[in-house]
């Protein structure tokens, strides 16, 4: 089957987990892993897996533009702001897994979130990918006036990039809650839990609504959970939604697939699984366009 070439920039936890997911794709051919530390575990694993590896960062794409049509950026918000302009000049489709928010926000569980005509899209944050679908579901039936989310992740699953981006995480997730989730006002908090053994990713979503309808909200939440589970099987409700006046609280748990980090790192898994799904939609579109072009030439 025809595949579209891709590269990953960023050989940390997220980039390495994404590498293992891309290996299974039927429409994306991972061609290279790019980092800046030759001793990083991600570059070592990529080399062992047979991928071309580079330790000179974005320069690898500049020097070898044919490496990839789709570039996944798993570096940092600061680095992506520089990468974005370069990759735009090189006409690469960019899927940004940092909180840079350079391109429009994308959450694959939200079907009216059109993005295939964009060159650069942003995957918001791990907390955003877990919670924004629920905010969106509630808003669709009850009009969310305020939404607050608390994402709790194992400290062991948070690499240096995640730790350096805490401020960007809260700002970008807040924006995503409002712009994609539909809440009039949003707030986001992240907690790194050092507990041993490491805990699974847990998310709490608190919404105040204008039009309380417990039955409709309950059904909307369950439908959205099932939709997210189509690409993140470990995504689940920790308990049934709680209702109190005009307020609804939802408790989620995300267990990772264990592709790179152990299953407690659901925060990595939901981010990379969402990025894979978005990348495959872009790849499918590219393949379809190439087929149409060949057919038109044949005519």
From Swiss-Prot:
A Pfam cross-reference name: AcetDehyd-dimer
Gene Ontology terms, MF aspect: acetaldehyde dehydrogenase (acetylating) activity; NAD binding
Entry's Gene Ontology BP terms: catabolic process
Record-linked InterPro entries: Acetaldehyde_dehydrogenase, Acetylaldehyde_DH_C, NAD(P)-bd_dom_sf, Semialdehyde_DH_NAD-bd
Record: residues binding NAD(+): 11-14, 157-165, 267
Alphabetized UniProt keyword annotations: Aromatic hydrocarbons catabolism, NAD, Oxidoreductase
Residues of the active site: 126 (acyl-thioester intermediate)
Reaction equation(s) it catalyzes: acetaldehyde + NAD(+) + CoA = acetyl-CoA + NADH + H(+)
SUPFAM superfamilies with a match to the protein in the record: Glyceraldehyde-3-phosphate dehydrogenase-like, C-terminal domain (SSF55347), NAD(P)-binding Rossmann-fold domains (SSF51735)
Enzyme Commission number(s): 1.2.1.10
NCBIfam families xrefs: ac_ald_DH_ac (TIGR03215), PRK08300.1 (NF006157)
Family membership: Belongs to the acetaldehyde dehydrogenase family.
This protein's name: Acetaldehyde dehydrogenase
Organism ancestry: Bacteria, Bacillati, Bacillota, Bacilli, Bacillales
């Amino acid at each position: 089957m025809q595949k579209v070439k891709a590269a990953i920039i960023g050989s940390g936890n997220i980039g390495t987990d994404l590498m293992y997911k891309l290996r299974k794709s039927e429409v994306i051919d991972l061609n290279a892993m790019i980092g800046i530390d030759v001793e990083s575990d991600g570059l070592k694993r990529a080399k062992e897996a047979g991928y071309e590896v580079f330790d000179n960062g974005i320069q690898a794409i500049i020097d070898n533009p044919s490496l990839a049509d789709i570039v996944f950026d798993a570096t940092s918000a600061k680095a992506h702001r520089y990468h974005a302009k370069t990759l735009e000049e090189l006409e690469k489709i960019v899927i940004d897994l940092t909180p840079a928010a350079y391109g429009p926000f994308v959450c694959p569980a939200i079907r009216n979130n059109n993005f295939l005509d964009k060159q650069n899209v942003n995957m918001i944050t791990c907390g955003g990918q877990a919670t924004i679908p629920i905010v969106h579901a509630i808003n669709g039936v009850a009009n969310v006036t305020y939404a607050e989310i608390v994402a709790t992740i194992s400290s062991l699953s948070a690499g240096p990039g995640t730790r350096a981006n805490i401020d960007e995480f809260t700002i970008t997730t807040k924006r995503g809650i409002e712009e994609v989730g539909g809440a009039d006002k949003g707030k986001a908090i992240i907690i790194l839990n050092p507990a041993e053994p490491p805990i699974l990713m847990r998310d709490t979503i608190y919404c105040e609504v204008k039009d309380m309808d417990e039955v409709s909200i309950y059904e909307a939440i369950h439908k959205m959970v099932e939709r997210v589970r189509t690409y993140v099987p470990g995504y689940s409700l920790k308990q049934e939604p709680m209702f109190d006046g005009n307020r609804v609280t939802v408790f989620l748990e995300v267990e990772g697939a264990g592709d790179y980090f152990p299953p407690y790192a659901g925060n990595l898994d939901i981010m990379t699984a969402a990025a894979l799904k978005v990348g495959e939609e872009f790849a499918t579109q590219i393949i379809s366009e190439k087929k149409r072009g060949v057919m038109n030439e044949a005519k």
